Amino acid sequence: MKMNSKFKPLGYIVYEGPSLLDGSPIVIIINKIKAASKNAKTGALVQSFIIRSDINPVEALKTGADAAICGHCIHRPSLAAYTGAPPCYVNVGRSVLMVYNAYKRGRYVKASPNEVAHYLTGLKLRIGTYGDGAAAPVTIWQQLTQFTADHVGYSHQWLNPSFDHAAWSKLVMASADTIDEAIT
């Protein structure tokens, strides 16, 4: 992805590669660095979007191609329609689509996770504003969080037998959908 030189970058691309959930192409974009927040609950959090790099996120959601970034989360609309679970609360047609469109227009700069980690010094990072952090290598997130004041994230992948609990437990909490899951 070539940076459009007419514009100031909106954020950083820290990973472009295969999804660890299904092998499809994904991208991780870090943005909202130094941005103020109106969210009284979380305060200012640097945002991270895990999205398909080859498909508009609304289309990915409609076709089930969002499995690359959400795995078997029961809140994916394509699964929620069958299970009766409430669909994901993220409005993909707004912020996620805006991030994807900016990515396609070249508004984000490629940078290593270690480089971006320095920009995040003393800040709080949200792992997976959209998408599950476990779609990408855990080392990406370990590098990004090395200087942060704090980070928050959830993963539905913790029930997957290949999920590295030891590595991920320092980064994300299990996203539990039932009381039984929560006490597991």
Regions found by a protein language model. Give the residues of each.
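Class I S-adenosyl-L-methionine
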Residues: M1-T184
